[in-house]
Structure formats: C-alpha cells, structure tokens
From Swiss-Prot:
HAMAP family: GrpE. CDD domains: GrpE. Pfam families: GrpE. InterPro entries: GrpE, GrpE_coiled_coil, GrpE_head. Signal peptide: none annotated. This is Protein GrpE. The lineage of its organism: Bacteria, Pseudomonadati, Chlamydiota, Chlamydiia, Chlamydiales. It comes from Chlamydia pneumoniae. Residues 1-10 have a biased composition (Acidic residues). Its main location: cytoplasm. One of its GO terms (biological process) is protein folding. Residues 1-22 are annotated as: Disordered.
C-alpha cells in the first residue's frame, strides 16, 4: 500500500498552495514594477514638458518686453534726429543761442547713451554698398564716379540692435549712367 499519511498530504497541498501563492505574488510584483516604471516615465515626461513650457513662456515674455522696448525707443528716433539737425544750425547763431544749444546737446547725448545701453546703435551708410536689409533707396543718381549700388547720401540714419535692423536708413544710391545715343 502506498498510502501516504494524511499529515504529509496536507503538507504537500500546503506547499503547492504556497508555491502558487508565491508565483502569483511574484507575477504581481513584476506587474506592479512595470506599472511603476510606466507611471514614472509619464511623470518624467510631464515634468519635462512643464519645464519646457515654462522656459518657452519665459523666452516669449522676454521677447515681448524687448519688442515693446524697441518700439518705444524707435518712436524717439525722429525727434532725436530733428534735435541733431536743429543743433547743427545753432553754431551759426548768437552766443545766447549757442549756450541753449549746449544744454540741448547734453540732453541729446543722454538720449544717445540710453540707446547705447539698450543695445541700439546707429550705422553709417555713405560709401557702403546698398543692402536692401539695411537701406531703403529713396533716390538714385546717375554717376560714373563710384560703382553702381554705392550709397551717395543718407537722408535718415539707420539703427539696429545687434545685427538686426530696427529702422533702415533712407538713402540715395548711385546708378550707372544710361548710354547716350548718337544721332547722325
């Protein structure tokens, strides 16, 4: 007879049941680890997305503030140039006018210093080659004294921040003389 005692059978069933439970728990651990990794990956992705959004919004805010500052400063360019022209005539006036002009020149220099501090620089165009990104041709003049496309005169100064123009210079540009026809 191969009957096993009831104690061994119970123990055997208990062992099988424990093994099944351990196996089930190990599978559950694997499943939970996988879920945890997925949730952690999603969290890290959301965190990175949030950080990128924060940086993008900060950059957009800085660009908007820079744009607003540029537009405000651009509005001062024409009055400043008018003041420069007026001060140019002051040298031909009386001593009293020259003293007033000296004070206005100091104010003008303060404006220019503010522009410089904000990165706005004026650029010279006379004698340069015409560049449509930096110049607006308002007149042309036929001449053979300089190469075609050379800027002869500047009617309004150009200004830029870094390499980006904020107001192009208005200029007169040289063009090649038109050939004259011989009439016989």
């Amino acid at each position: 007879m191969t009957d096993t005692p009831p104690e061994n059978e119970e123990q055997h069933e208990s062992n099988v049941q424990n093994e099944n439970e351990v196996e089930h728990l190990q599978q559950e651990i694997v499943t939970l680890k996988t879920e945890l990794k997925e949730k952690n990956d999603k969290y890290l992705m959301a965190l990175a997305e949030s950080e990128n959004s924060r940086k993008r919004l900060q950059k957009e805010r800085q660009e908007l503030m820079q744009y607003a500052l540029e537009n405000t400063l651009i509005d001062f360019l024409n009055p400043i140039e008018s003041m420069e022209k007026a001060l140019g005539f002051a040298t031909q006036m009386s001593d009293d006018v020259k003293n007033w002009a000296l004070g206005f020149n100091m104010i003008l220099n303060q404006f220019k210093q503010i522009f410089e501090e904000k990165g706005i620089i004026e650029y010279s165009s006379i004698g340069q080659k015409f560049n449509p990104f930096l110049h607006e041709a308002v007149q042309t003049e036929e001449t053979s004294e300089v190469p075609e496309g050379t800027i002869l005169e500047e009617f309004a100064k150009g200004y830029k921040i870094g390499e980006r123009p904020i107001r192009v210079a208005k200029v007169k540009v040289a063009k090649a003389p038109t050939p004259k026809e011989n009439k016989e």
